[in-house]
């Protein structure tokens, strides 16, 4: 298995002939509005372009997983950092089959995407000769997660590959801990940018939560969702310092945009 990190939460899993695109934010730098104006410096998103190897990888994509997309079915509130207009256009143009939560299936189909599978939490479903399980995610602490319309993570078991748990946009919850302890993924992916809007509590794990997630992870951890969005204050350097302080750095990969990891 290879993990090709593109930008923020967008990456590609390569497994044999299959190239699985995760959460396609594919637009050029500055094509989305700022996600924070007062708490953090206002800047249009994404704050960086896709890496130079992105188009070659995207040309190979065969499937797509979307952890979350819609908020109450209202298009202007779509989570553009996980599915933007360029991502939609790509999926539609190339007829890429999408797997997402059942509650998001009709929304994506309404806008022209082909949803192959709608998943229910904790129910294992056949996927590419293996299995996929949706794990509930809580997109923030306090009341804000209800406004954010929670998505999910994905636990993937593909033939002759290490298992992988993509935790998605979530804080540390009993469901996340259950996934780590019961499913025992060989690889885990955690969003560590600590996104926060101008109102409400953080939308992703705090540093302490991320460190605990990493401790609980049975195998290697990949950290993402950093250095591409103006409401994510934690960068790679800051994360490395935290990991070093907790003696966890060797357990974690922090890929640069365009970098590939082999497992």
Model-derived features with residue positions:
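Extreme N-terminal starter segment of soluble prokaryotic enzymes
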Residues: 1-3
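Catalytic core of the metallo-beta-lactamase
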Residues: 5-18, 126-186
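Pre-active-site segment of Zn-dependent metallo-hydrolases
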Residues: 18-89, 142, 172-182
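Active-site neighborhood of phospho(di)ester-bond hydrolases with catalytic His/Asp-centered motifs
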Residues: 21-23, 60-77, 99-102, 164-170, ...
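Short hydrophobic/aromatic-enriched beta-strand-loop microsegments
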Residues: 22, 114-123, 186-191
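Active-site environment of divalent metal-dependent phosphoester hydrolases
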Residues: 27-29, 69-83, 105-108, 123-126, ...
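Cap/insert and terminal regions of metallo-dependent hydrolase folds
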Residues: 41, 46, 99, 171-257
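Metallo-beta-lactamase
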Residues: 94-161, 241-263
